[in-house]
Regions:
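Non-cofactor substrate-recognition interfaces
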Residues: 1-310
Length: 310
């Protein structure tokens, strides 16, 4: 089947590209907008969840014929286990044998590699947490018209066009260093708790102690409302600490924190509020628009889609 993709040009290549809506963002958008829609290639796992044909280790899943259990890239194998033919060569041969390939040839092209391991990177669909920006894009677009931009073309053009087609914001980042997502879920993801303050977290830990999911409260010595440095020595909200905190559902089942951290741009956007400890202090400065919005901002044009957008 052939579908339209506006990111394909006649300037480079053939003007035709293969599409993998399961693994590529542009491919997914093109497949989603096609009529009828081209669904991503997903199959149910042993728990009934829809998963791609490739697992998180870069191997094809079981029960899909000749490619089952094989790595997508030869570089993923241990040195003494690298097969003579890579999986793409095996597939090409099979397509030729079945007379399903119009043409097969080798060519060199660039491919993203991990800077640490020097191995090929595999794009993979992951579960993430989003801010539903698409519900707010029209309001943001209209509010942007009230800003006195200099030059005006930046506000109406570059930034205005960005807001008009703003996508939902993926907050999740699969890293270690950063602000942990304050979201806890039970094993089957039927119940979530989103923590909005240190006080709320301390209270939830105390509830978990009653259910037997926590033995003690690591932040018991922290005094809510005490802003002295010595008090903040009694609390540590980094990932390696909060990942050990088990909260409890309404029925007492354990809940673990979502493993990801928050996109650093979210922190940047929180600056006007966080710098004055809003909403825990100085509420009038924000609620009565004394400190925010700003009267004047001078910033590089690159930050219109970065910090200023957040």
């Amino acid at each position: 089947r052939v579908i339209l993709g506006d990111f394909v040009t006649t300037e480079d290549g053939t003007g035709i590209v293969h599409t993998a809506p399961t693994f590529g963002a542009d491919d997914y958008k093109a497949a989603k907008s096609a009529k009828p829609e081209v669904p991503p290639l997903l199959v149910p796992d042993k728990n009934g969840n829809k998963v791609p044909l490739v697992d998180l280790k870069g191997k094809f899943i079981d029960d899909i014929g000749m490619i089952s259990g094989k790595y997508v890239k030869n570089e993923y194998y241990e040195e003494d286990k690298i097969p003579e033919k890579s999986i793409d060569v095996e597939i090409a041969i099979k397509l030729k044998e079945k007379n399903l390939a119009f043409r097969v040839e080798k060519y060199s092209h660039s491919y993203p590699h991990c800077w640490r391991t020097d191995k090929p990177i595999l794009y993979y669909p992951m579960e993430s947490w989003f801010i539903k920006v698409s519900d707010l894009s029209e309001r943001m677009f209209n509010l942007n018209k009230e800003i006195n931009w200099k030059p005006n073309s930046t506000g109406e053009g570059r930034f205005g066009n960005w807001l008009k087609s703003a996508n939902d914001w993926n907050l999740s980042r699969s890293r270690f260093w950063g602000v942990p997502l304050p979201i806890w879920a039970n094993e089957d993801n039927s119940e979530y708790k989103i923590i909005g303050s240190v006080e709320e977290l301390i209270n939830e830990i105390n509830i978990s102690i009653k259910y037997g999911n926590m033995k003690s409260n690591p932040f018991a010595s922290f005094e809510i409302g005490n802003m002295l440095d010595e008090n903040y020595d009694n609390i540590d909200l980094h990932k390696d600490i909060v990942d050990k905190i088990i909260l409890s559902t309404s029925k007492g089942s354990p809940m673990k924190r979502e493993k990801d951290i928050i996109d650093v741009w979210f922190e940047s956007g929180a600056m006007p509020y966080a710098q004055i400890h809003y909403p825990f202090e100085n509420k009038d400065l924000i609620d009565k628009q004394i400190n925010f919005p700003a009267d004047f901002i001078a910033e590089g044009v690159d930050q219109t889609r970065g910090w200023f957008y957040t």
